[in-house]
Amino acid sequence: MINIGIHGASGKMGQMIINCLKDSKDAKLTALYTIEPLGSVPEGVIVTDDLNELFANCDVVIDFTIKEGALNLINYARTNPKPLVIGTTGLGDDGTNLLNLAANAMPILYATNMSLGVAVLNRLASLAAKTLAEFDIEIVEQHHRHKKDAPSGTALTLAQHAANARGLNLKDVIVTGRDGLVGARSKDEIAVLAVRGGDVVGRHTIGFYNEGEFIEINHTATSRATFAKGAIKAAVWLSSQKNGLYSIYDCLGL
């Protein structure tokens, strides 16, 4: 049984992880970090706005915050090593560089999406992108109206898998919007388009289009619980790993 600390306990994902930990046989909640008031808290769980106290009362920290919060956590952990599961998206190149540096001192699992279904979707996308080399690739992602980053980290990861499968640099071929007289689509272009509205938890579709036929592969999340359970599984797995930067594929053995 490992002790879990949550960084970003007042957020939607933090609250979902708290709820899912109630039924876990492998992990228990021991500490919550938040700068905002919380409602009811399980008995015996420490609530704090001090990273020192958070780290002192758990074996693994799970982070679902915003870019600034996640980077601050990772920087702190560089001198106070603790296994970290980072689920915050939109970290950018500076965040990626920091993750690689910090992973020399502790095990870190970083994933833009913690669901098993999305992990398989990425593998299928790689296979299709390589096999269907003449097909055009378009990605559409849909999320609730409150999501702050676009395109989603999951969609960008999906695009990265497709680009890698074709030996392309994603930065050279990605298109995140079209407007006006843009001309014909280029051969290597990978479009990633974002839809925002309502309470959509998450829906990602990658399409492969050719003359006479097309294939679309879709993943729809109907509850944040799928991400929460994935993060808990990742935390349990990470607790016994050596220093290094890991992905959800390492955890799932994919």
From Swiss-Prot:
(S)-2,3,4,5-tetrahydrodipicolinate binds at H144, G153, T154. NAD(+) binds at G8, A9, S10, G11, K12, M13, G87, T88, T89, A111, T112, N113, M114. NCBIfam families: dapB. GO terms for molecular function: 4-hydroxy-tetrahydrodipicolinate reductase; NAD binding; NADP binding; oxidoreductase activity, acting on CH or CH2 groups, NAD or NADP as acceptor. It is an enzyme of class 1 (oxidoreductase). Belongs to the DapB family. The active site is at H143, K147. Pathway: Amino-acid biosynthesis; L-lysine biosynthesis via DAP pathway; (S)-tetrahydrodipicolinate from L-aspartate: step 4/4. Its EC number is 1.17.1.8. GO terms for biological process: diaminopimelate biosynthetic process; lysine biosynthetic process via diaminopimelate. Catalyzes the conversion of 4-hydroxy-tetrahydrodipicolinate (HTPA) to tetrahydrodipicolinate. Its main location: cytoplasm. Pfam families: DapB_C, DapB_N. It comes from Campylobacter curvus (strain 525.92). It catalyses: (S)-2,3,4,5-tetrahydrodipicolinate + NAD(+) + H2O = (2S,4S)-4-hydroxy-2,3,4,5-tetrahydrodipicolinate + NADH + H(+); (S)-2,3,4,5-tetrahydrodipicolinate + NADP(+) + H2O = (2S,4S)-4-hydroxy-2,3,4,5-tetrahydrodipicolinate + NADPH + H(+). GO terms for cellular component: cytosol. This is 4-hydroxy-tetrahydrodipicolinate reductase. The gene is dapB. PANTHER family: 4-HYDROXY-TETRAHYDRODIPICOLINATE REDUCTASE 1, CHLOROPLASTIC-RELATED, DIHYDRODIPICOLINATE REDUCTASE. SUPFAM superfamilies: Glyceraldehyde-3-phosphate dehydrogenase-like, C-terminal domain, NAD(P)-binding Rossmann-fold domains. It is found in: Cytoplasm. Keywords: Amino-acid biosynthesis, Cytoplasm, Diaminopimelate biosynthesis, Lysine biosynthesis, NAD, NADP, Oxidoreductase. The keyword NADP applies. InterPro entries: DapB_C, DapB_N, DapB_N_CS, DHDPR_bac, NAD(P)-bd_dom_sf.
